[in-house]
Amino acid sequence: MELKPNGNHNNNNAAEKSEDTEKAKAERTNWGNGLEFLMSCISVSVGLGNVWRFPFTAYENGGGAFLIPYIIVLFLIGKPMYYLEMIMGQFTSQGTVKIWSICPGFVGVGYGQAFGTICIISYYSSLLALTLYYLFVSFQSELPWSFCREDWQNCVDSRPAEYTENLITGLASNASTLASNLTTPFSNRGVSLLADNETVKLQSSSEIYFLDVVIKEKLDISDGIGSPDWKLTLALLASWVVIFLVIMRGVKSSGKAAYFLALFPYVVLFVLLIRAVTLEGARDGIIFFLQPQWGELLNPTVWKNAVVQCFFSLAVGSGPIIMFASYNRFDHGIYRDAMIVTTLDTLTSLLGGITIFAILGNLAHNLNIENIQDVVRSGTGLAFISYPDAISKFQAVPQLFSVLFFFMLFVLGIGSIVALQSTIVTIICDQFKGLKYWKVALGTSMCGFLMGLVYVTPGGQWILTLVDFYGGTYVVFILAIFELAGIVWIYGLQNFCDDIEFMCNRRVSLYWRMCWSFFTPVMMIIIFIYSMVTIEPIKYSELYFPEAGNVAGWLLFGIGAAQFPLWGLWYVSRHREGSFCSSIMASLKPSEKWGPANAEVKREWQIFKSQKAAQRAVQKESSKLGFFWRKITNFCGSNI
C-alpha cells in the first residue's frame, strides 16, 4: 500500500508549504563542489578510528581473528547503513532530526543520536589535547619518552634496540635485586622478564612517560578523579579554537579544509609504515595481525566488537554522514562516494593495523617476549605508547618523524570532531532558523571545552572508558536499529527504493534490498541482545569501576535510549488525531514535510510515486501468483 502524507492538502496550504520549502532551500548552503563532500566524508570516516581504535580493538580480539568478522560486518551492516544515511541526508536536505518527517513518531532517534554524538565529542577532544601535548614536546632535543629517569623502576629505554638489549641483560642478571621493588605502582603494568625464577615487571619508557608524566594516571578513582592538568587544559583549549575556526562558516570553511584533513594523514602514515616494516621483529607482529584464528568466528563478543568498531570508524549512527549529505545537490552521485569512502576506510584500517602491529612485533623482539599480546596493554593509550616507542627507534631525526606523526593524529582528530560538532550545530540551526551559524558554533565549542576538562584529569581515562562504553557504543547501537526499522519497516522498503530510484535515476540492487530488509537489522538485533544479556561490569586497566561508576554509566545509557520513546510520545501528544492509538498510527506516516526540499523537485517526485503506485496496481491484477507474488515484490522492493 502506498504511503501518503497525512494532514490537510488544500491549495492555500500547499502554496504556503511550497514557499516555505523554497525559502529553506535557498537558505541552506551547498558544497562548493562534489569533491569537497567526498573529502569531508573521508576526513570523518578515515580518522582516529582507523589509526587509534582499530589496532587496539583488533589487539583485544586476537589480532587476525578480528579481521574476518570485521569485513563480513562491513559488507552486511557497515556499507548498507552508510549508504542509507547518505541517501536520507541528500534526499531531504535536512539534518539528523529533521529527516524524521519520514516517520515523525521516530523523531526521538535523531535526538538520541545527537546525545550519543555529544558523548563522543566530549572525550574525542581530550584525545586531541594529548596529541597536541606530544606534538609540542617533540620539539625537544631528545624525545622525553625515549629514555628512563632515575626514579622509574624496572624501566626499559625506548631508544634503539642495541641499548635496550644491554639493559635487559643487566636486568636479567640482577633479577633477584629488582624483585624487591615490585611493590611499586608500576608492578601492575608492563611486561615480565623471567630470570633466576623471579618475575620482573618491565615497562618501556614511553609507557611510563604516558601513564605517569602525561596523564598522571590514577589506579583508583574511588576518592575522585582529581583536577585537570594545566598543560593538557591549554592543549584542549587550543584544540577547540582550531575546531571553531574550521566550522565557523559551515561547509564554506570546512569544505575547503577537508582537502588537507583527508589527504595529509596518508602521507605520514605511509612514511611510518615503511619505517615500521623495516624494524626487527616486525614480521612476527604483522603475521599475528593477519593470521586468522578460525575458532574466534564462533565468539559472539568478537562480532559485537566488530559492529561497534565499524560504526565508530564509519561514523554511522551518529549523524555526520546525514549532515554532510544534506548539503549536496539533489542529483549528486552519492553511490560512487559511498563505495569509495567505505572501501578506503577499510584499507586505511588495515594499513594502520599493519603499522601498529609491526611496531608491537619490534617491541616484543626488543623485550624478548614471545607472545605479542603481552607487550603492552590495550586501550586508548596504545597510540600514545607504541607509536612513540617506535619513533624513538628512528636512527635519523626522530623528532621530525614525531612531529609529523602527532600532527597527523591531530589532523585526523580534527577531521572527525569537525564532522561530529557540525552535526550538533546543524541540528540546532535547523530547529532555530534565526540563529547565526557562527554563534551556535562558538557556543557549542565552549561547551565542548568545558566537558573535555573531565578527561584531562588523572582519572580522565576512567571516565573516557565509561562514557565511550555506555554513552557512545550502546546508545548509538540501539538507536541505529530503530533508525533502520523506521525507514525500512515502517516507511517501507518499497517506498524507500522508489525514492532512491527517483533521486539517483538507478534501480536499487538486490544486495541493498536484502541487507536493509533482513541481514542488517537481524544481525544488529541479535548482536545487541547478546551483548546486553552477557554484559559485564566494565574495567579499566584490569580494574573494576566502583559501583557509583556503573550506576552513572547505566544512567547515561538510559538518558540516550529514552530519547526515542519520550520524543515519540511528545509528538503524539502535540498532534492528536482521534484516539491515542489513532494518533500513534498517524505518527508513523510521513508528514507533509517529507520529500525533497525543493518545491519543483518535490512535485516531480509526487508524480513519480503516483506512477509507481499505478504500475504496481496493474501488475498485481495481472499476476497469476497473487498473494505470494505481492509478498515477494514487497519484500524485495522491486517491480519484478
From Swiss-Prot:
Q: Can you say where in the cell this protein is located?
A: Membrane
Compositionally biased, Basic and acidic residues: which spans? 16-25
Q: Which residues of this chain are annotated as glycosylation sites?
A: 174, 181, 197
Which keywords accompany this UniProt record?
Amino-acid transport, Glycoprotein, Ion transport, Membrane, Sodium, Sodium transport, Symport, Transmembrane, Transmembrane helix, Transport
- Return the annotated region ranges for Disordered: 1-25
Q: Which GO terms describe its molecular function?
A: amino acid:sodium symporter activity; D-amino acid transmembrane transporter activity; L-amino acid transmembrane transporter activity; neutral L-amino acid transmembrane transporter activity
- What is one Gene Ontology biological process annotated in the Swiss-Prot or TrEMBL record? amino acid import across plasma membrane
Q: How does it sit in the membrane?
A: Multi-pass membrane protein
**Which protein family is it in?**
Belongs to the sodium:neurotransmitter symporter (SNF) (TC 2.A.22) family.
The protein here is known as Sodium-dependent nutrient amino acid transporter 1
Q: Which organism is it from?
A: Drosophila ananassae
